[in-house]
Amino acid sequence: MKMIRVVAAVICDSIQTKHRIYATARGYGDYKGQWEFPGGKIEPGEAPQQALKREIEEELDTEIAVHDKIGTIEYDYPTFHLSMDCFWCTVVSGELILKEAEAACWLTKDELDSVQWLPADQTILEKIREMMK
C-alpha cells in the first residue's frame, strides 16, 4: 500500500491556554466538506516543521510558529496509508486566509464534535481535547 507522509498544524489561540483550535473544511476530493487540521505533504529532504511552515504559508497565507509535537497518526485509507505528524502551532503573522479549504472555524474543546472530521484526524481529537483548557 502506498504511504503518504504529511504534517498537520493544530493552530491554537494561545500555546499556554489552548482555549480554541483552528480547523478547515476540505474543498476538494473524496472527502470534500469534511474537517481537518491544515497542513500537507512533506517534500524530500524537508523536516516536518519546515514542511508545516511552508504548507500553512501556501494554504492560509499565514506565518506560524511550530511548538510541541502532539503525536503521529497512522491511518489506513482505502487506497493509501497516511502517516501524519501533528504539532501545536500559533500564528506569528497573517490573517488565516483560505486558499484551498472551503470553510474554517475556531473550535473550543466542547465544540470539537460539532463538525465532521476526516477519519484520520478523528483519531487524535481526544488527545487534543485533554490538552485544551
Q: Residue ranges of each PLM-predicted region?
A:
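Conserved N-terminal beta-strand and adjoining loop/helix that marks the start
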Residues: 1-21
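Conserved hydrophobic "DFG−1" position in protein kinase catalytic cores
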Residues: 11-12, 23, 89-91, 106
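NUDIX/MutT-family hydrolases
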Residues: 88, 97-128
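The catalytic Nudix box helix
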Residues: 37-69, 108
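Generic C-terminal helix-cap and adjacent flexible tail
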Residues: 129-133
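A conserved beta-turn-beta hairpin within the catalytic core of GNAT-like acetyltransferases
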Residues: 30-34
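Active-site-adjacent beta-strand/loop module that shapes the phosphate/pyrophosphate-binding cleft
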Residues: 63-65, 72-95, 103-105, 128
